[in-house]
Amino acid sequence: EPESIGGTLERFGRVKLNRDPFSARAGEYVVTVTGSIGAVIPAQSTFKSDDTVINSGKLFILDSAYTLVATTDSITIRALEAGNDSKLNIGDTLTATAPIALVDSVVTTSAETIEPSAEENIEDYREKALDAYRLEPQGGAATDYRLWSADAQGVKQSYPYAKTGAVNEINLFVEATIADSTDVKGTPSALLLTDVEEVVEFDPDTTRPTYERGRRPLGVIVNFLPITVLNVDVVINGFVGLTVDIQNAIELALIDEINLVRPFVAACDILDEKNDILDSNKIISIILNTRPGSVFGAIVLNVGGVPYNSYTFINGNIPYVNSINFV
């Protein structure tokens, strides 16, 4: 359990992961400003995201003074609130909270230089700690790529596979945490993939000598790839005695169980925990476990828009429950 309730999770995590759970990370953004050449934007100037943007009313600060060298120039501002609640999109506008001489008060987001990240979920930290104890470093085997990927904030899991038909080439599929994904389904951003590449190349532990921090074996090519989310649609025919409460209970149970299905990597996963197949029998079992004695007709399962009786999730494919219908 976490130390906050008297447990020892973080203490054990520090031994293998060499860190506590990641704290939320504040985003940094390049914004376009207009004004007179030579105008100075003072350090600590503050900008507030406008009401028209998705995360409105958030404050951002300029850490160092900047002198405009062109009538249209750029500065880098940092969110005062860490996490995704202060995330900006390209094109979002902000307004200075106080007038700045010879500078337009409205600025426009043009780039994201540091991606914000949510605080690491304690269950994700627990899973990474367990993996760190269970998986032994092997100098470039599949287990190493999974362990190394866990050093990048925002990674929920990674799935390393040897690339078919290639020698010394790895496809490393990266799944983001829900909070840090681009679609709230697990798809990582390009910046997160870059972060994973950095920790696979080089150990982020700065207490170690530089010559000991290299990770990727010489001559090995690693392709850093996003997972692919496949929509899962389930149709349950002819359920007898269906009520709203029964329907809600079954839907929640199906969502919970289907979301646990993940690709199996033989080189670093435990065979007894293999859970990569979704089929009609599994859906029937979930329904009967949730509502014993249920009577219903045929189950129709679609994965990625294609009907299947059974589907095995491999490589970077993961499921997302798109719809559950009772007809």
Residue ranges: model-predicted function:
Residues 225, 245-327:
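An aromatic-glycine-centered, glycine-rich loop/turn in mixed alpha/beta architecture
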Residues 71-135, 139:
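Catalytic P-loop NTP-binding/switch module of NTPases
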Residues 41-50, 85-100, 184-191:
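Extended Gly/Ser/Thr-rich low-complexity repeat segments
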Residues 12-26, 103-127, 165, 225-229:
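Flexible hinge/switch segments at interdomain interfaces of large molecular machines
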Residues 61, 137-276:
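Carbohydrate-recognition loop of C-type lectin domains
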Residues 1-69:
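Extended assembly-interface regions of large multimeric machines
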Residues 1-9, 41, 57, 69, ...:
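Immediate N-terminus of the mature polypeptide
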